[in-house]
Swiss-Prot record:
Statement: the UniProt record of this protein carries the keyword Repeat: no
Subunit structure: Homodimer. Polymerizes to form a dynamic ring structure in a strictly GTP-dependent manner. Interacts directly with several other division proteins.
Annotated GO MF terms: GTP binding; GTPase activity
Gene: ftsZ
UniProt keyword terms in alphabetical order: Cell cycle, Cell division, Cytoplasm, GTP-binding, Nucleotide-binding, Septation
Name of the protein in question: Cell division protein FtsZ
PANTHER family for this protein: CELL DIVISION PROTEIN FTSZ-RELATED, MITOCHONDRIAL DIVISION PROTEIN FSZA
Any one Gene Ontology cellular component term annotated for this protein: cytoplasm
Length: 369
């Protein structure tokens, strides 16, 4: 056996598979990880584990697809939940921190999923994120933000929770329930499940021109001040078939409208950083990828954009398929959704007017009788 063959055999013995943990925290988080395994049961594997963590035993027991279930409780709680109190959720997480610390030993990357605005998800998620950051485990959060219909108190709790989370996590992705038509929150679950799947596959599936895990770490772990938010988004795959002379013009037109309807709070436009993965059908001989890149950069519209490109040549897609992971920075002090804030003010004004009208009606009725 020559030296090269010996080195090759040693290389085959190296175990460097990423260990990834997906933690659904609180009621909404439990629902999402359970839905992930319902729609994509093969996502869970030897190195990719899903967990449901809750202070509500009844809700936790109801989840059937996720097998790793963890109850956080203390002598005052006894598995009855956090009562919508983030401080209680944080306290329960602190009482569980030793177990969580042991549980996450050996992980390289963790995704924390939660609904913000109530107790366990809002309070516990920043606590767990801080533990992971202390252990130097790359961690990101995917969070839902309540609609106005859920009440201003709930929204205020969510906003305060995001400020705490922002100091702990490497980055987070925000889904606004306000954008769910008619309050159908199952839509949020479906969108977030897709985001989790796309994020995991972007990181774990090797490419011929590869995006390695250190690229991913560098993407998420950016220095920030407490005044900065660091948000990310992962797109749905954008697929296109080049089958005519004007295909590049059609590609530009369709990509311009890509993400026009987005349920997340931020799109790829104006992104500071991008990880772009392109699957290209190897049967395409004449494909000017430089033109495609130019179209993508035009949509992102940031001349200081940092980009890392991954490419794979496959036979199982129409022509080209693109995934984009993008990062943004926004001041925490600004409203998360300016349009939503304006709508909130209009609705509050309307409520005040209705209240005043109601008082006039009552006064008028009293005068009659």
């Amino acid at each position: 056996m020559d030296e090269n063959e010996t080195q090759f055999n040693k290389l085959n013995q190296v175990k460097n598979k990423l260990k990834i943990g997906v933690f659904g925290i609180g009621g909404a988080g439990n629902n999402i990880v359970d839905a992930s395994l319902y729609h994509y049961p093969n996502l869970a594997s030897e190195n990719i584990h899903f967990y449901a963590i809750n202070s509500d035993l009844q809700h936790l027991a109801f989840k059937t697809n996720v097998k790793n279930k963890l109850l956080i409780q203390d002598h005052t709680n006894k598995g009855f939940g956090a009562g919508g109190d983030p401080a209680k959720g944080a306290s329960l997480a602190i009482s569980f921190q030793e177990q969580f610390n042991t549980l996450t030993d050996g992980y390289d990357f963790c995704i924390l999923v939660a609904g913000f605005g109530k107790g366990t998800g809002t309070g516990a998620t920043p606590v767990f994120s801080k533990i992971l950051k202390t252990k130097k485990i790359l961690n990101v959060a995917i969070v839902t933000y309540p609609s106005l219909n859920e009440g201003l108190t709930v929204r205020n709790k969510a906003t305060k929770g995001l400020e705490i989370l922002n100091k702990a996590t490497d980055s987070y992705m925000l889904f606004c329930n306000e954008k769910c038509t008619n309050g159908i929150y199952q839509l949020a679950n479906t969108e977030i499940v897709s985001a989790i799947k796309n994020l995991i596959e972007l990181i774990t599936i090797p490419l011929q021109q590869n995006i390695d895990f250190e690229d991913v770490r560098a993407f998420f772990q950016t220095k920030k001040t407490n005044q900065d938010q660091q948000l990310f988004t992962v797109t749905h795959p954008f697929s296109f078939s080049f089958d005519s002379k004007d295909s590049i013009e059609q590609f530009a037109k369709q990509f311009k409208n890509f993400e026009k309807v987005s349920y997340f709070d931020h799109s790829i436009v104006g992104a500071k950083k991008v990880l772009l993965k392109a699957n290209i059908n190897q049967k395409i001989v004449k494909l000017n990828f430089k033109q495609i890149q130019d179209i993508i950069w035009t949509k992102i519209d940031n001349y200081q954009l940092e980009i890392r490109l991954g490419v794979d040549f496959v036979t199982t897609i129409p022509n080209i398929q693109i995934f984009i992971l993008s990062e943004h920075k926004n001041p925490v002090s600004l409203p998360i959704d300016n349009k939503s804030t304006e709508n909130n003010q209009n609705k509050l004004k309307l409520l005040d007017e209705l209240k005043e009208l109601g008082m006039k009606y009552v006064k008028h009725q009293n005068q009659i009788y």
